[in-house]
């Protein structure tokens, strides 16, 4: 039976009902999607905060966190350089739990006993053995208290008491001192929270007359002269809170030399210094910087001043000629120039202002710009916590303004980034190609972090074909030891040698490195370096592999026929070293031993037959010579590419590198594939 046809009105009514139902259904779907979105947001935000932000460093001086995947990093940088050669390639089959069969022991396995440090009068090391015995006994006690939790409880009690008595330290917006106040403080003005962009320091002073020096540091005595007249002073921004017990880094060294410079003319010299290693000096000698030379915030590095000689450069001669012709043609010079004298004069008051710009420091004297010095890698404004003024100068007053009013922390451990990205991989079951033992001090938190973030990211280290560990003794400060233990437990790359640390006993860490590399890992090669040494891992391993496997080897920057210094800071007494010459020895910042030599060193130590000397690198040379003479011939391989002082192009190791320079060296190596130095101004 055929259905009756619907009228137009009925059809419209049905269509309206359909549209209404469709709208309701759309609203319901939209509400469901919105509810689902809210649920996702609710669960996702805590996850992001928990996993993402927790891995970010709170240290404003550190670089951004590395990408989670090295593969992602490679994709981002692929146009510049494929990173297969340096960075570890992640495998999809790998899981976080894989390879956890062996974990690094925090405490060294090197065996100490009461007989270990019995002094021997035969080799002149009586005093060294005595101090080693005391250091071991004290260190053992410190470690026991650290393990039991006594140290942590004592520290919490001390901290609470300190806050009750003194409150928390605050940062001042400005600091001012009179000349007499500065003198009372040992010519040091503390800058509580360092400097920041826009900070400025004003010094009002008067240079003194020249005095005679028989041993001048800035010039050489002429033949027949007994002394030279010198007048100079130094303003230095120093990192007073960098590492306790060490020379503070000189973040800026400003040295006006009125008289006595080797050039015979007044100059202003500027530089930086880290661990007694000076950079390349910037000297202003009265000539204006060239037009094609880089500027600092638009200012030239050196302004011109009147010189008392008639020597002029070719550029100046041509400039004068052009000005003369311009004057003849137009009738007047293009611009009026004033030639100022050298900004400092004996017994004449001056006002010097040092300001921190975007690209560097700017120095003006009596309102006139004199010189600008660009910031250097590894030296930052925040770390400049002290101003020192020394030399031939009478200071009337010092004022520092626009200082930062807050700083996150000056504790050394602020540099630690507790991220799993930097944790050491587990020890492999198979033999490793090379073990690298890194000498470090307890409070060198920044140095260790820089090593983790730089050359320890090499694919050979991440894949455990090369294993690297820090070797640290116990510190005199309780809080350092507490933080050190936490660091060791988290990163898994620290081996603590249980004795109280001192420079003369560094040799014990070296023996511990040999024990770990030869016994714990059975590594083919054992390398020793310092925590301010950058290691080009693949090149160093290739250098070691050049020697046939059945040969004993000793590789490094080897010194021959060196004699002991009998005077000065590094002096050695005849009781300590009676011989006239040292044995051939490789410089301490980086050298390699074969496994058999390392085993010999440990064996002699455990039998209490190992002769020890306070200079660690000389000690190793002495042990290698003993092995060479009595056990098996050794191949001595000398290479200047194990750089002792600073960095050279095509280095194998670079020494005296600050934490930021370490990161810079790694970035250059990753991006270019070539060992290039940083800070080569």
Curated annotation (Swiss-Prot):
Q: Which residues form the Galectin domain?
A: 187-401
User: For this UniProt entry, which segments traverse the membrane?
Assistant: 29-49
Pfam families attached to this UniProt entry? Gal-bind_lectin, Galactosyl_T
Q: Which SUPFAM superfamilies match?
A: Concanavalin A-like lectins/glucanases
Instruction: Give one GO biological process term.
Output: protein O-linked glycosylation via hydroxyproline
Its keywords, alphabetically, are: Glycoprotein, Glycosyltransferase, Golgi apparatus, Manganese, Membrane, Signal-anchor, Transferase, Transmembrane, Transmembrane helix
- Topology feature Cytoplasmic, residues: 1-28
Q: Where is this region: Disordered?
A: 57-80
State its Enzyme Commission number(s): 2.4.1.-
Coiled-coil region(s): none
Pathway terms, separated by semicolons: Protein modification; protein glycosylation
Q: Which GO terms describe its cellular component?
A: Golgi apparatus; Golgi membrane
Subcellular location, record wording:
Golgi apparatus membrane
* SMART domains with a match to the protein in the record: Gal-bind_lectin (SM00908)
Location (main, coarse): Golgi
Q: Which cofactor does it need?
A: Mn(2+)
What tissue specificity is annotated for this entry?
Answer: Expressed in junveile leaves and stems, and at lower levels in cauline leaves and siliques.
Entry-linked InterPro entries? ConA-like_dom_sf, Galectin_CRD, Glyco_trans_31
Instruction: Spell out the Basic and acidic residues composition-biased ranges.
Output: 62-78
Q: Its family? A: Belongs to the glycosyltransferase 31 family.
| PANTHER family in UniProt | BETA-1,3-N-ACETYLGLUCOSAMINYLTRANSFERASE (PTHR11214), HYDROXYPROLINE O-GALACTOSYLTRANSFERASE GALT6 (PTHR11214:SF352)
The identity of this protein, by name, is Hydroxyproline O-galactosyltransferase GALT6
Q: Which organism is it from?
A: Arabidopsis thaliana
Annotated gene: GALT6
């Amino acid at each position: 039976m055929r259905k009756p046809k619907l009228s137009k009105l009925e059809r419209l009514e049905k269509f309206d009902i359909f549209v209404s139902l469709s709208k309701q259904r759309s609203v319901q779907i939209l509400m469901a999607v919105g509810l689902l979105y809210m649920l996702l947001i609710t669960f996702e935000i805590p996850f992001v905060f928990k996993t993402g932000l927790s891995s970010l460093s709170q240290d404003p001086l550190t670089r951004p966190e590395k990408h989670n995947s090295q593969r992602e990093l490679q994709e981002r940088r692929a146009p510049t350089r494929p990173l297969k050669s340096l960075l570890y390639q992640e495998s999809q089959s790998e899981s976080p739990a894989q390879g956890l069969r062996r974990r690094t022991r925090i405490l060294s396995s090197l065996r100490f006993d009461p007989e270990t440090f019995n002094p021997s009068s035969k080799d002149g090391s009586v005093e060294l053995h005595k101090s080693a015995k005391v250091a071991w006994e004290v260190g053992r006690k410190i470690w026991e208290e650290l393990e039991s939790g006594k140290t942590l409880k004592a520290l919490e009690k001390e901290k609470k008491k300190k806050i009750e008595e003194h409150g928390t330290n605050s940062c001042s917006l400005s600091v001012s001192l009179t000349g007499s106040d500065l003198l009372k403080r040992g010519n040091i003005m503390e800058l509580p929270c360092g400097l920041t962009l826009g900070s400025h320091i004003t010094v009002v002073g008067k240079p003194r007359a020249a005095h005679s020096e028989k041993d001048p540091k800035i010039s050489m005595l002429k033949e027949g002269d007994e002394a030279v007249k010198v007048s100079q002073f130094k303003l230095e921004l120093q990192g007073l809170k960098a590492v306790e017990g060490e020379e503070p880094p000189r973040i800026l060294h400003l040295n006006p030399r009125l008289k006595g410079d080797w050039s015979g003319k007044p100059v202003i010299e500027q530089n930086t210094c880290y661990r007694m290693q000076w950079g390349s000096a910037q000297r202003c000698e009265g000539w204006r910087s060239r037009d094609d030379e880089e500027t600092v915030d638009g200012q030239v590095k050196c302004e011109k001043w009147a010189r008392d000689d008639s020597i002029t450069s070719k550029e100046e001669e041509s400039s004068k000629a052009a000005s003369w012709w311009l004057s003849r043609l137009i009738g007047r010079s293009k611009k009026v120039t004033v030639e100022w004298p050298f900004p400092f004069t004996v017994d004449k008051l001056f006002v010097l202002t040092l300001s921190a710009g975007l690209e560097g420091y700017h120095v003006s004297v009596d309102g006139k710009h004199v010189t600008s010095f660009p910031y250097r890698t590894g030296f930052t404004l925040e770390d400049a916590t002290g101003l020192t003024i020394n030399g031939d100068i009478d200071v009337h007053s010092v004022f520092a303004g626009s200082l930062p009013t807050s700083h996150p922390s000056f504790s050394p451990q602020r540099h630690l980034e507790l991220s799993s990205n930097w944790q050491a991989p587990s020890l492999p079951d198979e033999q490793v190609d090379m073990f690298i033992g890194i000498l470090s001090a307890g409070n060198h938190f920044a140095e260790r972090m820089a090593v983790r973030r730089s050359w320890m990211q090499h694919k050979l280290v991440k894949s455990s074909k090369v294993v690297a560990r820090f070797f640290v003794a116990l510190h005199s400060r309780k809080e350092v030891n507490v933080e050190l233990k936490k660091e060791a437990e988290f990163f898994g790359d620290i081996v603590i040698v249980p004795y109280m640390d001192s420079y003369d006993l560094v040799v014990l860490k070296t023996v511990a490195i040999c024990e770990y590399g030869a016994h714990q890992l059975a590594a083919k090669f054992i390398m020793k370096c310092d925590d301010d040494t950058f290691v080009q891992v693949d090149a160093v391993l290739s250098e070691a592999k050049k020697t046939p496997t059945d040969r004993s080897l000793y590789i490094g920057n080897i010194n021959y026929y060196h004699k002991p210094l009998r005077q000065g800071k590094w002096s050695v007494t005849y009781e300590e070293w009676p011989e006239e010459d040292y044995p051939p020895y490789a410089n301490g910042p980086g050298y390699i031993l074969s496994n058999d030599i390392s085993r010999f060193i440990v064996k002699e130590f455990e039998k209490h037959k190992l002769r020890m000397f306070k200079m660690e690198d000389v000690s190793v040379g002495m042990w290698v010579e003993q092995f060479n003479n009595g056990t098996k011939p050794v191949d001595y391989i000398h290479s200047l590419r194990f750089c002792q002082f600073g960095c050279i192009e095509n280095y194998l190791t670079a020494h005296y590198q600050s934490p930021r320079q370490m990161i810079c060296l790694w970035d250059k190596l990753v991006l270019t594939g070539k060992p290039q130095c940083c800070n080569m101004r």
